[in-house]
């Protein structure tokens, strides 16, 4: 059996997220390992971070965070919450697994697809409302997430 080489995280992120530079004029990629391996893309009104989180109980995973800089409130949301807030799909449909090189590439590819779909909203006039909705956590009295109503019509489900 052939030995599998680990992925070069920054190179793989660049391969899948290059559309941010080509189509949206974002600066980057800028690689950092301050706390977690991460790749940053940015423009004055928007930042996108792609992180590799290793060693937690869920195994290695990839997270994509979107931030609106220069706001007087914490304008940051995870990709999976933005996908649900935009009524594209339930948050659990956004991939995050990276336990193998193939799983990491699949997750990066799917995350890039979700971000492509979100970019018009993230650069649109209602971006702050979308970010606030993505950060709303409706929970029951025990702290569990409340179920969505049965009438939700997902755009990409």
Regions found by a protein language model. Name each.
Residues 1-16, 28-157:
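Intrinsically disordered, low-complexity regulatory regions enriched in serine/threonine/proline
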């Amino acid at each position: 059996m052939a030995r599998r080489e680990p992925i070069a995280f920054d190179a793989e992120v660049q391969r899948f997220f290059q559309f941010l530079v080509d189509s949206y004029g974002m600066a980057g990629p800028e690689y950092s390992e301050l706390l977690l391996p991460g790749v940053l893309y940015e423009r004055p009104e928007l930042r996108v971070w792609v992180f590799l989180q290793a060693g937690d109980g869920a195994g290695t995973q990839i997270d994509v965070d979107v931030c609106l800089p220069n706001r007087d409130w914490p304008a940051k949301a995870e990709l999976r919450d933005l996908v649900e807030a935009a009524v594209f799909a339930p948050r659990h449909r956004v991939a995050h697994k990276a336990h193998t090189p193939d799983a990491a590439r699949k997750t990066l590819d799917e995350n890039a697809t979700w971000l492509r779909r979100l970019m018009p909203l993230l650069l649109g006039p209602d971006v702050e409302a979308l970010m606030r909705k993505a950060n709303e956590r409706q929970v029951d009295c025990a702290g569990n997430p409340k179920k969505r109503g049965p009438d939700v019509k997902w755009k990409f489900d």
